[in-house]
């Protein structure tokens, strides 16, 4: 197969995003829709961040930075890793969102015929990124039981905690088992920590802290984080990744230089301002989303696949009401004006669970969210829409 043909086949292997499909329908319907299909925060980003972005533009701070980003921002980001897990700033890369960071990491570790391990219930873009990197996906149910999926072709393990869409928070035992397995098998562990500031039960376990106990050359964890969630900077597209070793950082730099050139300079100055805000914004944002989660659990508890212990979403089990959640979500949008994300894209292709699932956002305005839940319950014919 020619290179062009191979690239064409790779593109065709990427599933169409069910999230973008419902998003297009919402845009067509108009602003009166209760949009609970997408993770858009009600809490706005700090005013100091807005001012820092505008000031950077006004002062002409719009030239290229180095591919890994502003040195002062990389240094500040390295300091956000607790204890012995802190990387050197030279191994921290500023990226246009955590999504691009994960894509770049996968491209930097991929090889011909390689395999990446993904959670069975996963963010659809993770699967798209794996396929785009030319890797083959395999899916795991338990991050503490990975040996049955092992083969020499496995090069990456993606872990997402708190998880999108389920809200599952992996405990210390599960994270330790996944890390030990990856270190023993020499598999790169990609830790998607986008929702690190939204843990409602237990304490977040961080693979990088475990990695720090290994000799420098044996470390395997890429820690990926974002400003989109805690700091409410979704449209700014600002994230970062810490590479496990100097060699991995050199290879990641090649990918970024070839695909990115450099992150947005004004946005990086906005990121510095966000970090200078301290924890007050993060604490208030966490409290708001958690209170919304509690109310959604009270209203819709029987529909939840499980109570989300973290993150911005709840995964609904609608299998008693439909065998086609895509159709149900379209009908819910048309008849009740409520958008939720159909579940097909959150599980492996062809998984029979997908048509019975849907994802509901918890991070939007509380009263609007609760009204959306009431409409959903009424639409399903339940009597407890309260």
Where are these regions (language model features)?
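Conserved core segment of the aminotransferase class I/II
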Residues: 214-290, 379-380
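Hydrophobic residues in well-ordered beta-strands that form the structural core
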Residues: 118, 139, 191, 340-342
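N-terminal small-domain helix-loop-helix segment of the aminotransferase-like
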Residues: 8-99, 104, 274-277, 383-386
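Conserved glycine-rich beta-strand-loop-beta hairpin in the small C-terminal domain of fold type I
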Residues: 272, 288-297, 305-318, 356
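Conserved core of the PLP fold type I
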Residues: 61-180, 197-215, 384
């Amino acid at each position: 197969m020619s290179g062009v043909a191979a690239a064409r086949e790779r593109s065709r292997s990427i599933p169409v995003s069910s999230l973008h499909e419902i998003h297009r329908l919402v845009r067509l319907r108009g602003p009166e829709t209760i949009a609970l299909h997408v993770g858009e925060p009600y809490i706005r980003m700090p005013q100091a961040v807005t001012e820092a972005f505008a000031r950077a533009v006004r002062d002409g701070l719009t030239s290229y930075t180095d591919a890994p980003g502003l040195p002062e921002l990389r240094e500040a980001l390295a300091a956000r890793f607790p204890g012995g897990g802190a990387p050197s700033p030279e191994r921290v890369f500023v990226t246009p969102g955590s999504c691009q960071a994960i894509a770049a990491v996968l491209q930097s570790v991929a090889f011909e015929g390689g395999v990446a391990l993904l959670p069975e219930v996963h963010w659809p873009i993770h699967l798209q990124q794996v396929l785009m990197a030319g890797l083959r996906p395999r899916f795991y149910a338990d991050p503490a039981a990975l040996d049955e999926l092992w083969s020499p072709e496995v090069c990456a393990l993606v872990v997402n905690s708190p998880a999108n869409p389920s809200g599952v928070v992996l405990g210390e035992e599960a994270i330790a088992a996944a890390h030990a397995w990856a270190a023993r098998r020499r598999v790169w562990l990609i830790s998607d920590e986008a929702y690190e500031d939204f843990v409602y039960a237990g304490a977040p376990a961080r693979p990088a802290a475990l990695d720090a106990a290994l000799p420098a050359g044996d470390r395997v964890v890429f820690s990926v984080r974002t400003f989109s969630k805690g700091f409410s900077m979704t449209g700014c597209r600002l994230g970062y990744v810490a590479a496990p070793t100097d060699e991995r950082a050199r290879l990641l730099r090649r990918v970024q230089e070839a695909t990115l050139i450099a992150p947005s300079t004004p946005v990086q100055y906005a990121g510095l301002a966000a970090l200078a805000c301290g924890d007050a914004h993060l604490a208030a944002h966490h409290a708001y989303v958690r209170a919304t989660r509690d109310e959604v659990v009270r209203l819709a508890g029987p529909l939840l696949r499980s109570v989300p212990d973290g993150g911005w979403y709840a995964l609904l089990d609608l299998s008693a009401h439909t065998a086609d959640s895509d159709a149900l979500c379209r009908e819910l949008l048309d008849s009740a004006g409520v958008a939720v994300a159909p579940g097909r894209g959150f599980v492996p292709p062809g998984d029979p669970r997908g048509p019975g699932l849907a994802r509901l956002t918890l991070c939007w305005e509380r009263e609007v969210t609760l009204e959306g839940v009431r409409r959903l319950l009424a639409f399903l014919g339940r009597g407890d829409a309260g």
